[in-house]
């Protein structure tokens, strides 16, 4: 092989045999026997070969013999999600069975057809529904996307079409249908598309029962035709075909008021008379017990249509997090918030320390706001705002200490400087 410099003395203008660009339009032109190739075409060929090798090589989690067991999945969830032990066990088994079905086909050697087990998560805001789904997808190394049920409408109406969910999933895997078919879709706020009454509606309900009807086929399994990257701008392009029967759908919602529906059915009698307004810990435990007794008929009374419930055969409930669980969430998981902020402070050369009483004060604030674990970050952000603003401008800070008084707004964080005595300094 020779480069273009050896042919320049002849005065003849040389061109790439692949793309047709001249030697003046590229950085390098490599010569072979009566053929030339430019550096741009070499890079393109390398990319093509790299992609094919990547597609033909299964990741460890894609081989059936190395499919994580339910115990493996549960242990990984334990690293990131505090509490919700029963929900984690149910999810681990359902996800394992789903991917075992994908790897071995829908039909066993005995001719038994394996059904699809989509999942319904019921639990209060901030109890970990979204985190569980995200952690599962990350552990299994599969494409993951989220959708908000409140933005969905039937096709032809203003709003987001249900098939846009598959479009988002394709975007996460560079529009590769085969990869998308191994993905997980989490649909949040599913309780918000309940119909207004238990009886079938005779009027069009485009954001309630209508969306449930539109989601039926998608969740059960259909061949969805999705426009490629260009979408409607390039109508001449062929649509991508995605088999949604291979996609795992997880739906989640708070289902506020569902406990009253269950209570009426089991007739516990906790909502009548002098005890009606009493909300003690004992009463809250009773509500938790009620959720464990959930039946499909309760979801029908709540407003989900029977056909939709049938497409979500695996149902599990998450309990409301107590103060102790919130304290653990702040410090124990691998990506705990205190560890995240600690890493940010470490980049500034300072150690961030949270005293135990500070963690309890943060948890108490989150409990008062009734936002669950979701409200923890906003509390920490507000507490650390001034310190994070001033710290890059201060020199010699080796440690920042946060205690209960800082969380309650009674004092400033304690800044410890290198080679100096410990003292409290305002972040202003």
Curated annotation (Swiss-Prot):
Q: Which SMART domains does the entry link to?
A: AAA, ClpB_D2-small, zf-C4_ClpX
Task: Note the coiled coil stretches, chain numbering.
Answer: none
User: Which N-terminal residues, if any, form the signal peptide?
Assistant: none
MF (Gene Ontology):
ATP binding; ATP hydrolysis activity; ATP-dependent protein folding chaperone; protein dimerization activity; unfolded protein binding; zinc ion binding
Task: List the transmembrane segments.
Answer: none
Biological processes per GO annotation = cell division; proteolysis involved in protein catabolic process
Residues involved in ATP binding: 124-131
Location of the ClpX-type ZB domain: 4-57
Q: Name one Pfam family in it.
A: zf-C4_ClpX
Listed binding positions for Zn(2+) are 16, 19, 38, 41
Mention any one GO cellular component term assigned to this protein in its UniProt record: HslUV protease complex
HAMAP family given in the database record:
ClpX
Assembly mode? Component of the ClpX-ClpP complex. Forms a hexameric ring that, in the presence of ATP, binds to fourteen ClpP subunits assembled into a disk-like structure with a central cavity, resembling the structure of eukaryotic proteasomes.
Which family, according to UniProt? Belongs to the ClpX chaperone family.
Protein name per Swiss-Prot or TrEMBL:
ATP-dependent Clp protease ATP-binding subunit ClpX
């Amino acid at each position: 092989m020779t480069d273009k410099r050896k042919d320049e003395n002849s005065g003849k203008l040389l061109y790439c045999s692949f793309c047709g660009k001249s030697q003046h339009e590229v950085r390098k032109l490599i010569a072979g026997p009566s053929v030339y190739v430019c550096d741009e075409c070499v890079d393109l060929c390398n990319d093509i070969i790299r992609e094919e090798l990547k597609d033909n090589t299964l990741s460890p989690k894609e081989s059936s013999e190395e499919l994580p067991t339910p115990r493996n999945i549960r242990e990984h969830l334990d690293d990131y999600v505090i509490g919700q032990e029963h929900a984690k066990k149910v999810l681990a088994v359902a996800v394992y069975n789903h991917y075992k079905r994908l790897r071995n086909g829908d039909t066993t050697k005995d001719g038994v057809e394996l059904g699809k087990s989509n999942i319904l998560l019921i639990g209060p805001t901030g109890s970990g529904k979204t985190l569980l789904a995200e952690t599962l997808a990350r552990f299994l190394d599969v494409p993951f996307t989220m959708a908000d049920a409140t933005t969905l409408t039937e096709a032809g109406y203003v709003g987001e079409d249900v098939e846009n969910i598959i479009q988002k999933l394709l975007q996460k895997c560079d529009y590769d249908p085969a990869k998308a078919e191994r993905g997980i879709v989490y649909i949040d706020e599913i309780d918000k598309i309940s119909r207004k009454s238990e009886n079938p509606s005779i009027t069009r309900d485009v954001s309630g029962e209508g969306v449930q009807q539109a989601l039926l086929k998608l969740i059960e399994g259909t061949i969805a035709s999705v426009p490629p990257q260009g979408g409607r701008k390039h109508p001449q392009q062929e649509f991508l075909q995605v088999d949604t029967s291979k996609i795992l759908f997880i739906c989640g919602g708070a289902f506020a008021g569902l406990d009253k529906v269950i209570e009426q059915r089991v007739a516990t009698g906790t909502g009548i008379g002098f005890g009606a307004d009493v909300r003690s810990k004992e009463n809250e435990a009773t509500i938790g017990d009620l959720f464990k007794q959930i039946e499909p008929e309760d979801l029908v009374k709540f407003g989900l249509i029977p056909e939709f419930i049938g497409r979500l055969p695996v149902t599990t409930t998450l309990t409301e997090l107590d103060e102790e669980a919130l304290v653990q969430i702040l410090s124990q998981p691998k990506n705990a918030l205190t560890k995240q902020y600690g890493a940010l402070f470490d980049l500034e050369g300072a150690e961030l320390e949270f005293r135990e009483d500070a963690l309890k004060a943060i948890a108490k604030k989150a409990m008062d706001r009734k936002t669950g674990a979701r409200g923890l970050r906003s509390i920490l952000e507000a507490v650390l705002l001034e310190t994070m603003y001033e710290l890059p401008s201060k020199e010699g800070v080796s440690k920042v200490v946060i205690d209960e008084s800082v969380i309650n707004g009674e004092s400033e964080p304690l800044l410890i400087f290198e080679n100096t005595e410990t003292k409290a300094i305002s972040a202003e």
